[in-house]
Amino acid sequence: MIDCASDILGLVDVQPTFMPGGELAVAEGDATVPVINRLLRQFDHAFATQDWHPPGHSSFASAHPGHQPYDVITMPYGPQVLWPDHALQGSANAAFHPDVDLTKVEVIVRKGFHPQIDSYSTFFENDRRTPTGLDGWLRQRGFRRVFLAGLATDFCVAWSAEDAIRLGYEVVMMQDACRGIGVPLGNGRTTMDEAHERLVSLGVQMITSDQLGA
């Protein structure tokens, strides 16, 4: 199923800050690590993203007096969920998880370092216009299909998948190599439900590692 010339595995924010014990812990986030390592053995090429925030970043609830984590405010680029302080530049929890084998990772994209704008997607800042440079690198290398794994399903992975589709890539989400946050939206729905419906409607393929032969 994998075309070693045109397929690439993308690892999204596989950092302790998003795992149990981290500042913005995703339930079972650490369970993605062994699956990701199995996937890495199947691919010849990989890239990784790293959330990398300065202190006082505008997406932190602590930067907005009177607000709490998971409140939603309006920023110049649109709605913004406010997060606990996390992925602080240079901190141990902002590093990649130490058990992830980065041998095949050919490029690392740091995101979220601009103080006044958040960055979920591997391709664009949250204004959906400012590029990270990843698209140009992938095109120069001739990659056409992106397999995504990492954290969190309903934010950084989902936004990455959506932008990749918009840019003309085929996208496969490795469901057992991802975990989500699930922010409540009301009516019993969460951001996980919304993300899944949106991505399926866009044509993102959802599979698990056993379907890939990993």
Where are these regions (language model features)?
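Short HxH-centered metal-ligating active-site micro-motif
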Residues: 50
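Active-site-adjacent betaalpha module
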Residues: 1-10, 14-18, 22-25, 31-45, ...
